[in-house]
UniProtKB/Swiss-Prot annotation:
InterPro entries: Peptidase_S1_PA, Peptidase_S1_PA_chymotrypsin, Peptidase_S1A, Trypsin_dom, TRYPSIN_HIS, TRYPSIN_SER
Record: glycosylation sites: N55, N79
Disulfide bonds: C60-C76, C158-C235, C191-C214, C225-C253
Prosegment residue ranges: 23-34
Protein name (Swiss-Prot/TrEMBL): Serine protease 27
Subcellular location field: Secreted
Domain Peptidase S1, chain residue ranges per copy: 35-277
Mod. after translation: N-glycosylated.
Tissue expression pattern: Expressed predominantly in the pancreas.
Biological source species: Homo sapiens
Catalytic class of the enzyme: hydrolase
Length: 290
């Protein structure tokens, strides 16, 4: 007599488990499905975007990739041991008076990729471990990291976000609202060609390394800038946002023939996996492109 009653209970438990899993799915904002030339974002539009702060001041962006981990750029940290100086702001749309949906988290440790050797170097990635797991909300959610099988095709439109300067000369005006900018992926041979141009104007040729990715416009005018470093370049693949790159470097901001250069996340899959073994990566079969 009691046995049939166990079936609905089992179904209920399975359903509850699926709901809990769906509630923490990466790369899916719940609210919605200032860069150079950028535009204001909406509340909860990019719930993985974080502000990394030193002594209370924003200096780099980053992305929440797990409840206790943030992905950013290695060049953001000159001294990875002074963790007491750093804090991470999550769930914020603006830096001045972030609002009720935002929270601050302390930093436990910073792991910079040991292969990073300085400005415009390969391996410009770092992982920031927070002191405690953060609760996922409508405004705080992780972005998906792509499996190495995922290829972000040339011309694909992706988005870069951050609180950086709107130009080389100006600061983002208060209340410093998070900016977003759509940028197309540029293939590496073309990007190398662009970075070899204009040497008569004093530019030094730069080489786009194997773990780098270019995105932006040949004519310039729109780009990430100072203060955006470490932030995410994300692409909508299927129904999920995958982080293709980490904002790394460029020649000035939004200059002609000088698109933004990002560190390719898939190139550092093994390093990230070593530090966060339980982190799951989104494979190409779930919507990626080959």
């Amino acid at each position: 007599m009691r046995r049939p009653a166990a079936v609905p209970l089992l179904l209920l438990l399975c359903f509850g488990s699926q709901r809990a899993k769906a509630a923490t799915a990466c790369g899916r904002p719940r609210m919605l499905n200032r860069m150079v030339g950028g535009q204001d974002t909406q509340e909860g539009e990019w719930p993985w975007q974080v502000s990394i702060q030193r002594n209370g001041s924003h200096f780099c962006g980053g992305s929440l990739i797990a409840e206790q981990w943030v992905l950013t750029a290695a060049h953001c940290f000159r001294n990875t041991s002074e963790t007491s100086l750093y804090q991470v702001l999550l769930g914020a749309r603006q830096l001045v008076q972030p609002g009720p949906h935002a929270m601050y988290a302390r930093v436990r440790q910073v792991e910079s990729n040991p292969l990073y050797q300085g400005t415009a170097s390969s391996a410009d990635v770092a992982l920031v471990e927070l002191e405690a797991p953060v609760p996922f909300t409508n405004y705080i959610l992780p972005v998906c990291l792509p499996d190495p099988s995922v290829i972000f095709e040339t011309g694909m439109n992706c988005w870069v976000t951050g609180w950086g300067s709107p130009s080389e000369e100006d600061l983002l005006p208060e209340p410093r609202i998070l900016q977003k900018l759509a940028v197309p992926i540029i293939d590496t041979p073309k990007c190398n060609l662009l970075y070899s141009k204009d040497t008569e104007f004093g530019y030094q040729p730069k080489t786009i390394k194997n773990d780098m990715l270019c995105a932006g416009f040949e004519e310039g005018k729109k780009d990430a800038c100072k203060g955006d470093s470490g932030g995410p370049l994300v692409c909508l693949v299927g129904q999920s946002w995958l982080q293709a790159g980490v904002i790394s470097w460029g020649e000035g901001c939004a200059r002609q023939n000088r698109p933004g250069v990002y560190i390719r996340v898939t190139a550092h899959h093994n390093w990230i996996h070593r530090i966060i073994p339980k982190l799951q990566f989104q494979p190409a079969r779930l919507g990626g492109q080959k």
